[in-house]
Design a protein with these regions (language model features):
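Active-site acidic/histidine proton-transfer and metal-coordination neighborhood
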Residues: 4, 11-104, 111-113, 183
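Hydrophobic residues within beta-strands of alpha/beta enzymes
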Residues: 3-5, 40, 133, 167
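Histidine-acidic metal/acid-base catalytic patches
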Residues: 74, 87-197
Length: 197
């Protein structure tokens, strides 16, 4: 089973500036069909910071996300977007997009790095707006040793919300042993299973 297909090229390239964005998303939708994945991951990190405050740029982002969201919805799948906005900003953006094919792919790291209350952010978004979660933080320590991420509190919050789904481990590597993939991911997965299962 495949959790999601990532369009990670959009971390480095701007979804706003690519003329062929629909073709790129369509390629992802084809891959999803082949892999039987129900979620695509679309990070908006490649867009120049501050786009959400410039009306012309925001309008174009909303238009493009509505188009690709409707493409996804017509195939019975969802595109999960990652933004740097807070939860209220994400809710507002989703309302503007107004497509059942666009939801939030929530990343713990964004809330934590910006000093936001992670559990409060989850509650504001609510279970219906979150398609998947990057259960990860900045590299430094693995999840069991992360002092700013209370995973038990996160579990209680998600349970209270009634949310269930994929928790995708992306980073949270030991900074002194970042290349040891087996150790880092093995440690994180073991810990998540202890907390969530």
């Amino acid at each position: 089973e495949v959790s999601s297909i990532a369009m990670s090229g959009f971390y480095g390239q701007s979804f706003l500036e690519r003329a062929n964005y629909k073709d790129l998303v369509q390629d992802c939708l084809h891959a999803m069909k082949v892999m039987n994945a129900k979620v695509a991951f679309l990070p908006l990190g490649g867009i120049k910071a501050g786009w959400e405050k410039i009306p012309a740029l925001r309008t174009e982002v909303v238009k493009r996300l509505k188009e690709v969201g409707d493409m996804a919805a017509s195939e019975g799948v969802v595109i999960g977007i990652e933004t740097q906005l807070d939860a209220k900003g994400d809710v507002k953006l989703l309302k503007e997009i107004n497509s059942p094919g666009i939801k939030i792919y929530f990343k713990f790291q964004n809330a934590l790095e910006n000093g936001r209350d992670l559990c409060k952010e989850l509650k504001i978004l609510g279970k219906k707006r979150i398609c998947q979660i990057h259960c990860t933080d900045t590299d430094g320590v693995t999840l069991p040793y992360n002092e700013r991420l209370d995973m038990n509190k996160v579990k209680k919050t998600l349970d209270k919300m009634g949310w269930s789904g994929w928790l995708v481990v992306e980073r949270s590597r030991d900074k002194d042993d970042v290349r040891n993939v087996k150790k880092n991911y093995g440690t994180n997965i073991k810990y998540l299973k202890e907390v969530f299962q």
